[in-house]
Amino acid sequence: MLLVAVNALVGGTLGQERTILPLLAGQVFQLDLYTSALTYILAFGVAKAATNYFAGTFSDRYGRKPVLVTGWLVALPVPFMLIFGPSWGWIVAANVVLGISQGLTWSTTVMMKMDLVGPERRGLAMGLNEAAGYLGVAGTALATGYIASTYGLRPGPFLLGAAFIAVGLGLSVLTVRETRHHAGTEAAAHVPVHSGTHAGLSSREVFTLTSFRDRSLSSVSQAGMVNNLNDGLAWGLFPVLFAAAGLSIERIGVLAAVYPAVWGAGQLITGALSDRIGRKPLIVAGMIVQAAALAMVAVGADFGIWLAAVILLGAGTAMVYPTLLAAIGDVAHPHWRARSVGIYRLWRDGGFAVGALLSGVIADAYGIPAAVGVVAALTAASGILVAVRMRRADHISAG
């Protein structure tokens, strides 16, 4: 539960940007092209994706707690860069730093919970972890929308992020304990789920297995990437779309908060559900639901339709997000599970960068609804690929 609280603070640190930065790009820095405005998500996604990989490797080598504390230390300058940044380049640089911090902190809370709970409740643990993180994102997105409407886009919203970082660092240093030895205990009784997933693999072999060779691991990796591709679109272009339709900052803040709120709260149910019915059905259904929600955003034109769409998008993402992480934990051997999680998160958070670039280019050329429609089609295709390629019974029955 301490790690759940820490990850809520990790999510809050990210949530300080969700409502504000898309508006900051246009209203303060006068960025007209969507591709230019989305550079901060591209920078965040590349930095976080790369750091996820190293977080897994460093956690295996040095332990989980040192990586977690380092992530909080890296985050310290972010709110001040966002508050005082005189140019858009400062905002992009702040998101590089934030991406590094998020890669270290969020990845480590995932690994530590996997270490602690064992295989039978892995979905429940991932649901708790991701629910805490995205409820933190949602609550902060909503709070910063109201703060900005009263006090302006800077500095008020980012002072909340500074407080989260201070508390998260204090908790991680003073109260969090190392969990790596639990993975060693689990490894002694581990029964491989698939052939080729034995203990003695090099980092290169783990990368190729997770990314390409294993049908289940690679299916999960591509689905994670597409999921965050559409989240990058939602983060960067939804507030711009809503503002262009005449919605107030308060209403934009509500829509920006409802999506991760449903996503976060829903994972309290879907994570545990995947322990019972398996990972594959929830992943496939979740990707299809997301695609339908994105299609609603593309054709919608008012607050009511968009509210229904973001609720549906949050529900679909809740079905997928903890389930994908649990599926990685099911297949990966405890000796290299942290590395496999890091590689999955490399692909998944690389989706932020791909989504920002792809949706920005399409939006510049054809408008935001066209960009949303293309991403909806990609999301549906990803779900179909999981249905065809992923093995069916990937929840652990053998300890």
Give each language-model segment a name.
Residues 156-173, 372-387:
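Symmetry-related core transmembrane helices of the 12-TM Major Facilitator Superfamily/SLC fold
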Residues 96-134, 327:
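Cytoplasmic helix-loop-helix junction between adjacent transmembrane helices
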Residues 44-53, 138, 260-268, 352-353:
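Residue-level signature of mid-helix packing/kink "hotspots" within the transmembrane helices
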Residues 1, 181-220:
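Juxtamembrane intracellular "pre-TM" segments in multi-pass secondary transporters
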Residues 63, 84-89, 278, 299-301:
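Helix-breaking motifs and short loop linkers at transmembrane-helix boundaries and internal kinks
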Residues 1-45, 218-219, 223, 227-245:
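Helix-loop boundary and gating motifs at the non-cytosolic
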Residues 51-63, 267-278, 363:
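Helix-to-loop junctions at the C-terminal end of transmembrane segments
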